[in-house]
From Swiss-Prot:
GO cellular component: nucleus
Source species taxonomy: Eukaryota, Viridiplantae, Streptophyta, Embryophyta, Tracheophyta
Full protein name: Putative protein Brevis radix-like 3
PANTHER family on file: BRX DOMAIN-CONTAINING PROTEIN, PROTEIN BREVIS RADIX-LIKE 1
Coiled coil stretches, renumbered: none
Region (Disordered): 7-27
Segments passing through the bilayer: none
Species for this entry: Oryza sativa subsp. japonica (Rice)
Subcellular location: Nucleus
Assigned keywords, A-Z: Nucleus
Length: 213
């Protein structure tokens, strides 16, 4: 191509101003100039492309396997820590357990003072004084047995006391549904010892229940 350019220049010199002045000569010069520009552009573009390939040949491509993004639905939470309270205890969200059912109040022999002990078959002495100054023996609780009575309290029960015999005082509870129940039996310490109080209750239990309950 450069030889052609030299030949054209030589021929142009021999022809003199005649060839340059003709329209055909001007077109040839324009065509030659355009070809030179195209060659320069192609050559510079080729060099840039080769330089880019050489620069990126040693680096991994963003399209390669090592640069593939993970699946959007995958979340790696291994780097996250559990949120903790100031004291260091981790927050835990659990369903609260339902509260235990409320059992109906039971007024039975287990609540009577004149009962038998679970750990000691004897009688306890829990001395107390009545308003009149008489000292009474308060017995201990007995194991709940067949005489248990379950009462559903729909109103506040009313208590009242009866002197069934000299030295024997019984506190009753009026049940909301009607009738009475025993709450406490007290024996005068001056008249009853522990053994005698126990014998008295065993002999008079049925009579007291039939009369007052």
């Amino acid at each position: 191509m450069l030889a052609c350019i030299a030949c054209s220049s030589k021929e142009g010199g021999e022809d003199g101003s005649r060839g340059a002045a003709t329209p055909h000569g001007r077109d040839a010069v324009k065509s030659l100039t355009s070809q030179l520009k195209d060659m320069v552009l192609k050559f510079s573009g080729s060099n840039k492309h080769q330089h880019y390939k050489a620069a990126t040949a040693g680096s991994p491509s963003f399209r390669s396997r090592s640069y593939r993004r993970p699946y959007p639905g995958f979340i790696d939470d291994s780097a996250f820590m559990t949120t903790t309270r100031p004291g260091g205890e981790a927050y835990m969200y659990t369903r609260a357990a339902p509260p235990p059912p409320v059992r109906a109040a039971s007024t039975s022999m287990a609540t009577w003072d004149m009962t038998r002990s679970k750990s000691n078959r004897g009688w306890q002495q829990d001395a107390g004084r009545s308003p009149g100054g008489t000292t009474w023996i308060q017995s201990i609780e007995e194991e709940a047995g067949a005489d248990d009575v379950t009462v559903v309290e729909d109103a506040v029960p009313r208590e009242w006391t009866a002197q069934v015999e000299p030295g024997v005082q019984i506190t009753f509870v009026t049940l909301p549904g009607g009738g009475n129940d025993l709450k406490r039996i007290r024996f005068s310490r001056e008249r009853f010892g522990e053994d005698r109080a126990k014998v008295w209750w065993e002999h008079n239990r049925d009579r007291i229940q039939a009369q007052y309950l």
